[in-house]
């Protein structure tokens, strides 16, 4: 597959991800939005799991761990956007996770990054952190801590998913089951409260939730 095509796909994925987070931030019922998104993921990936082999017990453990980490990540995102602006939280969480992954991959995994590659990652992450910096606004300590915790969750589930894909005889087995189940914690949370979540939805939330669910995977 040509490298430019992979690069183009990654750009589209990044744009879709940014749109999803913008929808999440500027919504008065973000938990409901996540609940609808989780339902969309279930509807999309349930038919697909019938076309792949069942996961092994070891893969099941990784899939369950990934689902829990994704659940924590999504809840942290909600709280992060409650205490911090999108322009503050998003660059820190994304830049921080990239830096963590680069460090962990270099030290503990077989993936080796060249010195120039590592410096490039540092420069990009530094640029992302600068986007969040503002002289006008007081430093948002709570938002910063939540953004860092979000970055930790992103790095954690990315590592788990990377291991799962590599340990699968059929990579789609892990991928489809992971995408089917990773929204279940958020779905459960969205059903637990009376005044927010899936118990309080309207047409506008439904449309945005379906759009989110299509873009998110």
Task: Annotate each language-model stretch with its function.
Residues 39, 45, 102-106, 115-133, ...:
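Hydrophobic transmembrane alpha-helices of multi-pass small-molecule transport proteins
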Residues 73-74, 101, 157-158, 216:
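Functionally critical, cavity-lining and gating residues within the transmembrane helices
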Residues 1-68, 74-86, 133-148, 179-217:
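Membrane-interface interhelical linkers
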């Amino acid at each position: 597959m040509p490298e430019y095509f992979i690069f183009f796909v990654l750009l589209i994925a990044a744009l879709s991800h940014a749109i999803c987070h913008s929808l999440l931030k500027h919504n008065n019922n973000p938990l409901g939005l996540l609940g609808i998104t989780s339902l969309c993921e279930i509807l999309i990936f349930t038919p697909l799991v019938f076309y792949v082999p069942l996961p092994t017990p070891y893969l099941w453990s990784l899939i369950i761990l990934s689902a829990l980490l994704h659940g924590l990540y999504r809840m942290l995102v909600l709280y992060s956007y409650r205490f911090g602006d999108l322009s503050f939280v998003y660059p820190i969480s994304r830049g921080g996770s990239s830096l963590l992954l680069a460090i962990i991959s270099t030290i503990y995994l077989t993936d080796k990054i060249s010195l120039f590659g590592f410096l490039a990652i540092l420069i990009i992450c530094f640029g992302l952190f600068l986007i969040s910096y503002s002289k006008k606004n007081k430093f948002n300590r709570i938002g910063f801590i939540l953004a860092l915790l979000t970055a930790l969750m992103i790095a954690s589930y990315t590592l788990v998913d990377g291991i799962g894909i590599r340990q699968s005889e059929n990579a789609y087995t892990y991928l489809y089951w992971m995408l089917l189940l990773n929204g279940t914690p958020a779905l459960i949370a969205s059903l637990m409260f009376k005044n927010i979540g899936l118990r309080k939805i309207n047409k506008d939330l439904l449309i945005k939730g379906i759009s989110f669910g299509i873009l998110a995977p």
